[in-house]
């Protein structure tokens, strides 16, 4: 009997596969499948065995196997494109399952089902943790192609992705026979020094958390302070100054909707009060202040001093009531200015939400993956235009002028490097995240492009399962994307 080819030996299973036995994050994605690739060699030379790759599909593959629409997710995304790009998915929309067989595959290093630091290493009988090898953008493309071929795909009609997903899309373009058209959004031909520096700053936040322990931590006791700080830093690069000023300015949170988080003990002395203000927002603070010499601002002598009449929490932004009889006039005059604002509240909320759905080692793994991205690497020239001169497939490049992470100039460079590219602008003041928020514009640009270059696919109608009603709900909050009003958190 003839041995199976690598493609034929790939099997499909679900999230209960042994590779996920310690991975709590995989349960966040419903109805996804997991492909198991028996053997896969990474660019770094390491060989992985029984490699899980998570994916979701919508629609039906046609008999020619050429109506595949591939969606590539961003850094913290998952295979559940219905969560982060739901308003674009459905009949009559850009990602129409009545025309396309839509596939979204999870990247290596992500905590959502594909091989990563949180998946099981059969050789060590533990999760990979910090020993998970470096996986590149090209590794993602190579292993994803195996899954698509196993699904019966003969050609990708269109590959679409933003940010990190756009990097995968650009790499897919080099598979000229397999890929018919691409739509890279808010991405780059090579990861810039600016982006590399932001990734480094975020990783250093994680490294500096004492709980990180070189990456050897329990999945239920990860370095949340460091990971949360990294997420805050990243969020600032995903938005714009204009976006934050317009939404927050110097407003303070509504205490009835956003109670003051992690309220500190009521200060009993001026020193204690200063300590409260100074450590507000410090997730690793002590319960009570303790000086380096072992003394405490709340010592008995301090409590008996005249200044101990300062007995209420200094203003931290939310309105508070104070018993005027407990404070003398000079204390009231010295009452400090607000130190807790809506912008801070939003960042802390997002950090808290993120650390409940992501893993620190995975964050490090994926940001290092981004750093490897360079479309010219190993292709004989440092000139993108030179290495891409023979890539004649239709290309739609979408960019955002307010994007400070993947600048509009970089989108212009992408469009100029392809022989057959069109550049369109997404009008948004939201910065980089505009590609996950401006659904109407993104949908319109992609549909116009499809009608021009995929008319044969668009004229076909295939059967498909009814979509979850929540997929197209623009008012629901996304787990992996940006579908939320950032002033209604």
UniProtKB/Swiss-Prot annotation:
The processes (GO biological process) annotated in the record are: 'de novo' L-methionine biosynthetic process; L-methionine biosynthetic process; methionine biosynthetic process
Active-site annotation: 163 (nucleophile), 403, 432
**Which InterPro entries does the entry mention?**
AB_hydrolase_1 (IPR000073), AB_hydrolase_fold (IPR029058), HAT_MetX-like (IPR008220)
User: What is the annotated localization of this protein?
Assistant: Cytoplasm
Low complexity composition bias: which ranges? 299-329
Gene Ontology cellular component terms for the protein in this record: cytosol
Q: What is its main location?
A: cytoplasm
Q: Which residue positions does the secretion signal occupy?
A: none
Q: Is-annotated flag, keyword Transferase?
A: yes
**MF (Gene Ontology):** homoserine O-acetyltransferase activity
The AB hydrolase-1 domain sits at 69-438
Compositional bias (Basic and acidic residues): 280-290
Pathway-wise, it operates in: Amino-acid biosynthesis; L-methionine biosynthesis via de novo pathway; O-acetyl-L-homoserine from L-homoserine: step 1/1
What are the UniProt keywords, alphabetically? Acyltransferase, Amino-acid biosynthesis, Cytoplasm, Methionine biosynthesis, Transferase
State the similarity comment: Belongs to the AB hydrolase superfamily. MetX family.
Purpose of the protein:
Commits homoserine to the methionine biosynthesis pathway by catalyzing its O-acetylation.
User: What is the name of this protein?
Assistant: Homoserine O-acetyltransferase
Source organism phylogeny: Eukaryota, Fungi, Dikarya, Ascomycota, Taphrinomycotina
Gene that this sequence comes from: met6
């Amino acid at each position: 009997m003839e041995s199976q080819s690598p493609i034929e030996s790939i099997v499909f299973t679900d999230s209960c596969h042994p590779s996920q036995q310690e991975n709590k994050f995989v349960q966040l994605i419903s109805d996804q499948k997991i492909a198991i690739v028996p053997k896969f060699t990474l660019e770094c030379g390491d060989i992985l065995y029984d490699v899980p790759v998570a994916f979701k599909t919508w629609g039906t593959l046609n008999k020619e196997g050429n109506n595949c629409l591939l969606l590539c997710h961003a850094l913290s995304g998952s295979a559940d494109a219905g969560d982060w790009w739901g308003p674009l998915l459905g009949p009559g929309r850009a990602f129409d399952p009545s025309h396309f067989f839509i596939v979204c595959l999870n990247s290596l290093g992500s905590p959502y089902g594909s091989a990563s630091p949180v998946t099981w290493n059969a050789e060590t009988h533990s999760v990979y943790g910090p020993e998970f090898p470096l996986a590149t953008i090209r590794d993602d493309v190579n292993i994803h192609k195996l899954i698509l071929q196993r699904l019966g795909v003969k050609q990708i009609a269109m590959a679409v992705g933003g940010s990190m997903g756009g990097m995968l899309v650009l790499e897919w373009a080099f598979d000229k026979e397999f890929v018919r058209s691409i739509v890279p959004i808010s991405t780059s031909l090579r990861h810039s020094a600016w982006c590399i520096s932001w990734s480094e700053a975020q990783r250093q936040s994680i490294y500096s958390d004492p709980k990180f322990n070189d990456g050897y931590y329990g999945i239920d006791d990860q370095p949340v302070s460091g990971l949360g700080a990294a997420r805050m830093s990243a969020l600032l690069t995903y938005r714009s100054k204009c976006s934050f000023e317009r939404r927050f300015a110097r407003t303070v949170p509504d205490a009835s909707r956003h109670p003051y988080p992690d309220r500190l003990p009521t200060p009993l002395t001026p020193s204690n009060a200063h300590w409260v203000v100074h450590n507000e927002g410090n997730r690793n603070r002590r319960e009570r202040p303790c000086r380096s010499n072992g003394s405490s601002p709340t010592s008995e002598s301090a409590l008996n001093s005249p200044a101990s009449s300062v007995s209420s929490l200094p203003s931290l932004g939310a309105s508070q009531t104070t018993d005027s009889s407990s404070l003398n006039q000079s204390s009231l005059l010295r009452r400090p200015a607000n130190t807790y604002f809506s912008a801070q509240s939003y960042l802390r909320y997002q950090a808290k939400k993120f650390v409940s759905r992501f893993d620190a080692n995975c964050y490090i793994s994926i940001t290092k993956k981004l750093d490897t991205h360079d479309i010219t690497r190993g292709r004989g020239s440092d000139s993108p235009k030179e290495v891409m001169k023979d890539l004649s497939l239709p290309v739609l490049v979408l960019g955002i002028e307010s994007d400070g992470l993947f600048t509009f100039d970089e989108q212009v460079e992408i469009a100029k490097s392809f022989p057959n590219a069109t550049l369109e602008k997404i009008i948004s003041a939201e910065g980089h995240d505009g590609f996950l928020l401006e659904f109407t514009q993104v949908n319109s640009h992609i549909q116009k492009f499809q009608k021009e270059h995929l008319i044969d696919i668009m004229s076909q109608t295939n059967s498909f399962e009814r979509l979850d009603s929540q997929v197209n709900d623009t008012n629901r909050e996304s787990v992996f994307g940006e579908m939320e009003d950032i002033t209604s958190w």
